[in-house]
Amino acid sequence: MKVPDARAFGSVPTGPDGRVQAFRHFWRRPRPRRPTRSTQINAGCYVFRRSVLESIPAGRVVSVERETFPRLLASGARVFGHVDYSYWLDLGTPAAFVRGSADLVTGIAPTGALPGPAGSAIILPGAHVAPDSAVIGGSTLGRDVRVAGAAVVDGSVVFDGADIGVGVRITRSAVGASARIGAGTVVCDAVIGDNADVGADNELTSGVRVWPDVHIPPGSVRFSADS
């Protein structure tokens, strides 16, 4: 796969014939402003000959990226890579999960697994959205979710039974099952755990994670100065 910045994954440059030239891993990250020469990464799909499989030691954990592939290259073995330009996303963080979900809903990432056509949102049976609220940006609402008036859910995942209050704004976030978000609260780039109770007029942004069953009193958390 090709990605904008391979430093988070390690790069795998190939020659014109597709032959792998190196496996470059960045356990110590490169200095800032020094991008890698190759933006190709190892996406973790391999085809091995039986002889290679039989050469992998048994009885311990083996990293094929750190042990097997470097050994093959050092021995002069012919290792080839296929560059795939399909949609790909590393789902290793909550933010990536939310983005991946939105990409599926909107059709950016093609799939046959959606319960309906691609569009701006998926609203599962039993969920209720007030007429003056908006669910957009590839959002998903689980079963029995309640979205009160004047609320906006944009590019987010709201799990079953959550209650979204009047005037709430949820952007690029995940809201857990049966969580409650009080009126006027802003949730952006955040994760709200199952059964969490977030009081009115809070501001939860910038990667905040609220643990399950936590109660946040009204007006307790702010990320911006009051006007």
Protein language model features and the residues they cover:
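Short, well-ordered turn and helix-capping elements at secondary-structure junctions
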Residues: M1, R24-W27, Y85, S133, ...
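Short beta-strand-to-loop element that shapes/binds the nucleotide-sugar donor at the catalytic cleft/hinge
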Residues: M1-T14
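Catalytic-core segments of class I nucleotidyltransferases/pyrophosphorylases
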Residues: P4-A6, R19-P110
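Short, acidic/polar N-cap/turn motifs at the starts of alpha helices
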Residues: F9-S11, V79, T205
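Conserved beta-strand and immediately adjacent loop positions that scaffold enzyme active sites
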Residues: G10-S11, G44, G119
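Extended, small-residue-rich solenoid/repeat segments and analogous flexible loops
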Residues: R60, L73-G165, R169
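Glycine-rich hexapeptide-repeat left-handed beta-helix
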Residues: A150-V157, A162-S227
